[in-house]
Amino acid sequence: MSQRKARLSGAILIAFCLALLPCGCEGGGKSRPMGQRIEKKAESKSRLIVLPLQPQGGQAYNGIGLGVHFLLGNVVALHTVFKEFWFGWRVKKIFPQKKKLIAHCRGKDPRLDIAKLGKEQDIRYWLWGSVQKQENRTKIVLVLTDTKGESEERTTELILDPADQLIGFRKGFLTWLDACGFTFPDAQVAKALWPEKTTLKSLDLLGRDLEKYYLHASWGDKSPFDPELFDSAVSEAPFSYLAHDLKGWVRYRNKDYQSAEKSFQSAVKINPAGLGAISGLMWCAVYTHDVEKAYKWAMAKADIRGESREAARVSVDRRIKKAFQ
């Protein structure tokens, strides 16, 4: 009997102590703004994908929507609350046929079933929207969808002005992300605001070139690109990080690794935290079997995202082994 009393007293004491602890339930009665959540391990970070922006209903197609998509993809890649993730990795999964991607970029497709795609592709957050020309200015409408349905879609309207190197547009985007619950880490803000010296014409050319790249790369076209077709955006905006970065990937796709490296180096001089170009430099080093250079760029990328240098080195070893099997 005394043993039973002792056990009962112990259970009561434990229950009393637990009652004093602060409640940690994630599903409490209060709703949380999009993005606000209990801290999770790095491996459980969610993905955010940036879709090509579409022309506002009734407006003619140009490449600006794809150009802004490329800009935002490079910004979001710096946000360490998300896994690094690029639209180019899933083009064919989202648009199974070339004509579907082409129609989407022109605003002539049915709206994507983002909830279904999110579940299929394990992509929780989707950023999409439209471009609207208004006399002498360009309005960008952005929508952020949480496919787990824990909050409503969030929408914002921003003005795109190349005169300030697209910094005002990006500051507005970061402010909106903060309102959605995805505050950009202080250490990453300056990296997201590199001077993108471009023009609307260059963004148009860049977007048209990017569409060609996606179509060629995603559907296994074996013929090489004509790199001269991708010179126009760089010629129009010679100090544009985005233009040099895309040209690097075109040359990389052609397996012209030396020329690709030059383009990526030009991009990194403009934007030292450009993850796309730094990834390109790493891959050029992998395929030229320059192990030390591959380590250098992989670790630079890890530093920018606050990730493990050792894991970056291990990843390079694995990639080199796979590339030369």
What are these model-derived regions, one by one?
Residues 35, 92, 96-207:
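Catalytic-center loop of serine/cysteine hydrolases
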Residues 25-81, 198-215, 238, 249, ...:
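A structural "domain/chain start" motif
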